[in-house]
Amino acid sequence: MFHLFRLSGSAIAEMKQPFIKTEGQGKRVTAEIIEEIRSKLRPGDIFITRHDDAMSNLFLPGFWPHAALYIGPLSNRDDLGLPTYRDHSADVLEAKKDGVKLREVEETLSVDSFVILRPKISTAELDQALEKALTHEGKHYDFAFDFRKAERLCCTELVYRAFHGIGQWNLKLIKQSGHFALPAEELIRQGMQKGLVDVAMIFGVDGDTVEIGKKAQDLLLSTLKD
């Protein structure tokens, strides 16, 4: 099925599964939820997200199919002593079918579930990771999920190329459908097993409240396949 998704590309990205949601039912992450977590976000946070009714859920492995990188607003970057990069209102770098672009948090979190992973790296290492990530802005989306090349990037490849080789970050690609890649669930698993990330918060796994701390970690673990 993963191979079929590679071939179908953007067509499947647009499709929704029938009967998962009632007609007119919106996303479970509301504007109120986004405002609740906004002040808790930090530059370098990794967003892992899910749409309950996405057709791609049938083709991509695991509960969590998508990833994005939070760059942060100018004020947060100043507080951490990070470069401002550019005066831009968007603060998430995300690879979607229309390419690698800076986007508003509201767009990235227009989803049903999310988990926020916080990399355990120094400020200098974080600066390096964000600088690397932003070099990929404007590239096309990689519907082939080919991690051997950087001309086009899929969502998790953007995160992989931002952090891999910085500090203790050494993520192992896994073989799927004859090629090496890093699905979002594998990114989560390796990040937790190697102690590279903390689970900052989670939403949409067990109810519609934002959970933090150990409960957030336990809920995330409950979604991962053995």
Locate predicted features.
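Cysteine-nucleophile amide-bond enzymes
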Residues: 1-226
